[in-house]
A protein has these predicted regions:
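A small-molecule sensor/coupling module
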Residues: 1
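Solvent-exposed, non-transmembrane regulatory segments of membrane-associated proteins
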Residues: 4-15, 19-21, 25, 29-97
Length: 97
């Protein structure tokens, strides 16, 4: 299974990877062999993307998928890693004529 997460450019890579490894360790039903892995996979416009790989049985796929997603969010918070998201700032200029 693969899940992608993004983190701020301000977050040290090792802190992000540690948070991801904690999330993996706290997610039941992930297989130990083959081993899970976390990689820095992309430099985006406003964030860095990390790809989290793990293995589970087909019967456990959805439990692991959703459990890992929640655990990633919690681990990022515990490690003070900012999860990024796209946003748009709009400035409204008044018509002065």
């Amino acid at each position: 299974m693969t899940q992608k997460v993004t983190a701020s450019y301000d977050a040290p890579t090792e802190d992000v990877k540690a948070a991801c490894r904690d999330a993996l360790a706290n997610t039941p039903k992930i297989l130990e062999d083959p081993a899970s892995a976390v990689y820095l996979s992309n430099y985006g416009e406003s964030s860095i993307e990390y790809t989290v790989f793990c293995w589970c049985s087909a019967a456990d796929y959805w439990d692991v998928y959703f459990g890992l997603g929640e655990n990633l969010r919690n681990a990022f918070a515990a490690h003070s890693v900012e999860m990024t998201y796209d946003h748009l700032n709009v400035h409204i200029v008044e018509n002065r004529g």
